[in-house]
């Protein structure tokens, strides 16, 4: 096990800096079945499936910094509907792609863009 990173963590971890840590964490739990609790004074570790995202408060030294992330889910259509119900803006409605993904795209209230996909095969 490498000693340069925590056990079970990948080498690359996306980080979102937001001005509403609690709101964004709630959105991720409601829409993407994310797990993780907001921690004060430290980045919040959010787990989505087998992946980790760090989210932290903006302000002070860091300005809010949104992300563009591609996320595989069990049902892209249902996840898209949940995102819209949670206040996200539709960028692309669910559609099949030539590379086997059923994919949609939304922008959340905090300006993060989420491509939501389910692989269906070629």
Residue ranges of predicted features:
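Vicinal oxygen chelate
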Residues: 1-7, 11-19, 44-47, 60-122
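N-terminal beta-strand motif that seeds the catalytic metal site of vicinal oxygen chelate
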Residues: 1-26, 35, 50-52, 67-69, ...
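Short beta-strand-to-loop elements that line the ligand-binding cleft
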Residues: 14-16, 37-39, 93-96
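Conserved active-site alpha-helix within GNAT-family acetyltransferase domains
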Residues: 22-30, 104, 113
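Conserved acetyl-CoA-binding loop of GNAT-fold acetyltransferases
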Residues: 30-37, 87-89
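Conserved short beta-strand elements that form part of the metal-binding/catalytic scaffold
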Residues: 35-67, 113-118
